[in-house]
Regions:
Chain A
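A short, amphipathic edge element
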Residues: 35-36, 67, 144-156, 205-210
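Boundary at the C-terminal end of the N-terminal hydrophobic targeting segment
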Residues: 22-26
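Gly/Pro-enriched, hydrophobic low-complexity segments
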Residues: 90, 101-103, 111-115, 121-125, ...
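Bacterial N-terminal signal peptides that target proteins for export
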Residues: 1-11
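N-terminal mature ectodomain segment of secretory-pathway/periplasmic proteins
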Residues: 34-118
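Short amphipathic beta-strand and strand-loop transition segments with alternating hydrophobic
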Residues: 73-77, 155-161, 215-216
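Short, solvent-exposed mixed-charge patches
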Residues: 266-267
Length: 267, 400
């Protein structure tokens, strides 16, 4: 039995729902547009095969004190799976020779091994620490892991122009509940679908970090890589700058160079 | 040995100009404070020690060939046996397709557990360095490594045995009688020239890392036999022949690491032929809570049970023990870590307590702290001889 009071409530509820429904349809289009942009950015980076590069990390705290790390990196592109990568640490000197092997996956947890040269020991490590810092830097493991379309859901926000470039702005929400982020706001340029800026929002949806990319170069006539990545943590005042060098593509790497056995020999 | 090391060092020096990054060295200064007076008047109290280790490697032939040279030396204030030099590594490697050939002195590690290393048998323990058995002497060998789709295969031939190091008469952390290291006894008539062999298969199957190994040769762990020489009681190390099957496995799931090591041994035992077969197991887990209180800090809980079938005076320290520990990782710029571990004997209640912490200082130094306590050391317990050797160690290392 519906009395007048209930009827009025029902009307109110329906009235509240209508604008939402309209928004929802619009929302669906925005989700579709966001996903399209992510897929196109991913498509443009497909087929690089493998790559190697050197990397300098400069860690700064809020007092401006600085600490440096030198790393080298080898990546193997995998079909229908995340990339495989080896990272070798050259400095700080007490961790020289330490090597990190990861098999990234689109949705499953990554597989990770660490080689400790003093003990000659390879340890399989739990990969659930994706929100944890990589080498004490402002980059989390999930920030340096291979970026796969499937890892996020997307929403197109708007167009934006800065530095004389036209950009798409999209929001991407990590699918994995163990991610340290509620969402990331990403600026990609319309011409080449390169990422120029990411705002990272923590689980409370407060702005946590901003990553800016600079000094892009194109390789093999297709693949863009930034030489500079700058991560600033707004909550702690700390920052980490990555200076990439010596990019080299299609070195002929195979899967046998990305195994536990090969990790012990990595230099 | 030190003269030979210097000779090799100078022979390799011209190569170092090719690429300075191929050399890396470290100097350490270690201070140990013992909380109690020594049991023997010949032993000393607090102790200082200096260590030097250098590593040189050179790759050529498009990375198909490599040489590695790692000399190590320690000068100890009081213990002449702890003052020693060792060739940790000096080998040449040639890679053919999926196979590597190694000739020379190598150091390697097998296994997965934290509190005890049962499967790891190739290298002899350098126990004057540390009681935990994680410091190893270089092992001369010819070895092959072959990687295939069904796993990695390794084969070892070891033509020269390395004797375990023991503290000297003036050193701490030793049994009440000195180990006579100049008169080691061997079961094999070939003594240290017995050719040991080993085979290992290891593989990664999804979330499982597994290994199977077989060892045939001279047991790395000697039996210490009491003997009276010129009226003085000494311990003679006796190295028996051993066949050992080893199994190691780790299952990694989210924040859990489940670990197991098992060995089945057959000794040819001159002294107690009825005690030829034995087995030992260590197994447990490590669970980590990441990002404690929204910080970067991780805290891990380690729990491992240690069992050995040998009993009576053949029983090792870890025969029915439970080890519980915690690992704190700050994930800061200085890589600060702390590991605390308590191993308790379930029969006799003696306890071994260990604390290890480390932190980087600047870019080229690190500081580490280690403390070891032996408690509930009643006369019948296996830690009785260490009852007065609780210590705190501070180690400062400079890398260059």
């Amino acid at each position: 039995m519906i009395n007048k009071k209930h009827y009025a409530l029902l009307i109110t509820l329906v009235a509240m729902l209508i604008p939402n429904t309209v928004f929802s349809m619009e929302d669906e289009a925005l989700v579709k547009r966001g996903l399209e942009i992510a897929i196109e950015a991913d498509r443009r980076d497909n087929g690089f095969g493998d790559s190697s590069s050197s990397l300098e990390m400069i860690l700064r705290n809020r007092h401006g004190e600085q600490s440096e790390r030198q790393l080298r990196n080898k990546t193997l592109e995998m079909k229908d799976d995340g990339d495989k990568a080896i990272i070798i640490f050259d400095t700080p000197r007490d961790v020289k020779g330490t090597a990190f092997l990861s098999f990234t996956h689109k949705l499953d947890a990554d597989d990770q091994w660490l080689y400790l040269p003093a003990l000659k020991r390879v340890k399989r490590i739990a990969s659930r620490n994706k929100a944890g810092p990589f080498m004490g830097s402002e980059f989390a493991y999930e920030d340096i892991s291979s970026q796969e379309v499937e890892k996020y859901s997307y929403l197109y926000i708007k167009d934006d122009t800065f530095a004389e470039r036209d950009h798409f702005i999209i929001d991407r929400d990590p699918v994995d509940p163990k991610s340290g982020y509620k969402r990331q706001r990403v600026w990609l340029d319309k011409a080449e679908y390169r990422i120029w800026k990411i705002d990272f929002y923590d689980r409370k949806d407060t702005l946590l970090k901003t990553l800016t990319y600079d000094d892009y170069n194109q390789y093999l006539g297709q693949y863009w890589r930034a030489n500079v990545m700058d991560m600033v943590n707004h909550q702690t005042g700390k920052s980490t700058r990555l200076n990439w060098r010596d990019f080299s593509f299609r070195n002929g790497y195979s899967e046998k160079e990305f195994t536990k056995g090969a990790l012990k020999k990595a230099r | 040995m030190p003269k030979l090391l210097l000779l090799i060092l100078f022979a390799l020096l011209p190569l170092s100009q090719l690429n300075a990054a191929e050399w890396s060295s470290q100097i350490g200064i270690e201070a140990r404070h013992f909380f109690d007076n020594a049991l023997s008047p010949q032993q000393h109290g607090d102790n200082l020690s200096l260590t030097f280790e250098s590593e040189f490697y050179h790759d050529w032939d498009d990375g198909q060939q490599r040489i590695v040279f790692t000399p190590f030396a320690r000068i100890d204030q009081h213990d002449s046996e702890r003052s020693h030099a060792d060739l940790r590594e000096l080998y040449w490697r040639q890679t053919f397709n999926n196979t590597d050939l190694y000739v020379g002195v190598r150091k390697l590690f097998w296994g997965v557990t934290e509190s005890l290393h049962l499967v790891d048998i190739i290298n002899q323990s350098d126990t004057v360095e540390n009681l935990d058995g994680e410091d190893k002497l270089g092992q001369p060998m010819i070895s092959f490594f072959h990687s295939s789709v069904v796993g990695d295969w390794e084969f070892f031939l070891m033509p020269w045995f390395r004797e375990r190091t023991f503290p000297g008469i003036e050193g701490r952390l030793r049994p009440p009688f000195v180990v006579d290291q100049d008169n080691a006894q061997y079961e094999s008539g070939d003594a240290e020239k017995h050719i040991d062999s080993a085979l290992r298969w290891s593989h990664v199957i999804d979330d499982w890392d597994v290994g199977l190994s077989w060892f045939h040769g001279t047991d790395r762990t000697p039996q210490l036999v009491t003997q009276t020489i010129n009226g003085a009681v000494m311990l003679l190390p006796y190295y028996a022949q051993l066949d050992q099957l080893g199994v190691d496995a780790q299952y990694t799931y989210e924040s859990w690491l489940w670990k197991l090591e098992f060995v089945s041994r057959r000794h040819d035992n001159r002294f107690s032929p009825d005690l030829n077969r034995s087995s030992a197991t260590v197994g447990g887990f490590e669970y980590t809570w990441y990002g404690l209180f929204s910080s970067a800090t991780d805290i891990g809980l380690v729990m491992e049970y240690q069992y050995d079938s040998r009993d009576g005076n053949r029983a090792p320290i870890a025969n029915n023990d439970i080890a519980i520990g915690s690992r704190l990782t700050l994930n800061d710029v200085q890589d600060s870590t702390l590991l605390a571990l308590v191993a308790s004997d379930l029969d006799q209640r003696e306890r071994f307590i260990s604390l290890e912490g480390s932190r980087r200082l600047g870019e080229e130094m690190s500081i580490s702290l280690e403390a070891r306590f032996f408690s509930n050391t009643a006369p019948q317990t296996q830690l009785f001889w260490l009852r007065s050797d609780d210590y705190l160690e501070l180690l400062l290392t400079h890398y260059f």
